[in-house]
Amino acid sequence: MSRPTSKADLIDAATANYEKMNTLIAGLTENELSTPFDFSNDVKKKEAHWKRDKNLRDIIIHLYEWHQLLLHWVQSNKEGNYVSFIPAPYNWKTYGEMNVEFWDKHQETTLEEAKSMLQKSLNEVVQIVKQFSNEELFSKGVYQWVGGSTLGSYFVSATASHYDWAMKKLKAHRKNCAVK
């Protein structure tokens, strides 16, 4: 699927990838669900998230927290309270530390709670997307607080693209489980 360039495409991509991800999740075996994620033997998987996330709940919570970042950022800036997407004390160079904080915060959250939280937050994201026009979402310079990008690109990154990331990780875990 190509990167969305309209509100309809954005909503379609977000919901389609979310459904694809949920179909993949529904197909995970008990063994795949109960086996901790371990990508330490794959030298190509160097990014911090390959070590951070240990189970499906961790991935779902990561997606949920990035929805929350997006929702807070859009709402605050629409109200005239200009904040950056990545909240202080973090920035685009240190957001990995923020992701670890999200991970720590949710170690007592159950998988079912995480799934419910993610579904609810996706619904909120879609409702906010619907408030904007195509121009507001996909034209540069409409909102100063977006910087040199488009508002829509943030929505794509926090939804459809992030679900792709999750599916890639889940498929890698499934492959690891099959090898063992």
Regions found by a protein language model. Give the residues of each.
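Short secondary-structure junction/hinge motifs that connect adjacent elements
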Residues: G27-K46
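A short small-residue
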Residues: M1-S2, V43-E47, M98-H106
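Acidic/histidine-rich alpha-helical segments that form the ligand environment
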Residues: N91-F138
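Extreme N-terminal tail/first-helix region
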Residues: M1-A26
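A non-catalytic, amphipathic alpha-helix used as a structural packing/dimerization or gating element
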Residues: A13-A16, K20, E113-E124, S161, ...
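Short, contiguous alpha-helical
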Residues: S40-E97, Q131, E136-K180
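Short, contiguous, pocket-lining structural segments
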Residues: S2, D9, A13, K51, ...
